[in-house]
Amino acid sequence: KIIEKADIVKPLLIGSVAPDLFMIDTINGKAVNKMGFDTAKTSDAVTKLYYKNMDELPPMYKTLSSVQAKYLVLVFWDVECGHCQTEIPKLLEIYHDLRKTIDVKVFSVYTVDEFDKWRKYIIDKKLDWINVYDPIHINNIKTKYDIFSTPKVYLLDKNKIIKSKHMPVDKIPDLIKAYEEEEKAKRIAGETQRKIAE
């Protein structure tokens, strides 16, 4: 069991590239449900639906790797989670403040399949970031990202390197500020070394 757990968390270590995700957003969620994924009860049924709709699905995917931003907040959450109901609105406020001065995006992953409940929450709370879920179950997100409770928050850089993880959302501005200061110090040190070398 310990080795299994180590194999799961190894790709999630700070400094690692975040595992990619192939997700469906709210716009394409209805189309995927019409294909029958919302009523498929077994993995065999989902597999058959996947192969039946294989040509239509790839253009619908939103991938983590395709999101372009200097900083990317990756958050896994559930509408029914009491802690998420506190943290997600806080994250929205932080996101709106941060994006005024820094290139930051949020890739918000719903960990359950209740599309209508999720979509209603997004509309009601005006979550204007990237909202995705996995109705096709191709990502195995709970294992891939070691999700045993929600919300689970990661802060990634522009190369999708995990900079921080498992922090409360109110720590995100301080973390980004620290990374910005670190980057500035490295840039100044590099310029100083170039001048000395000349």
Task: Give the residues covered by each predicted segment.
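Extended hydrophobic-aromatic, low-complexity segments
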Residues: 30-33, 74, 82-87, 100, ...
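Sec-dependent signal peptide cleavage junction
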Residues: 38-53, 170, 177-198
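N-terminal targeting signals for export/organelle localization
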Residues: 1-20, 26-47, 192-198
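Thiol-based oxidoreductase modules, predominantly thioredoxin-like and allied folds used
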Residues: 101-117, 126-138
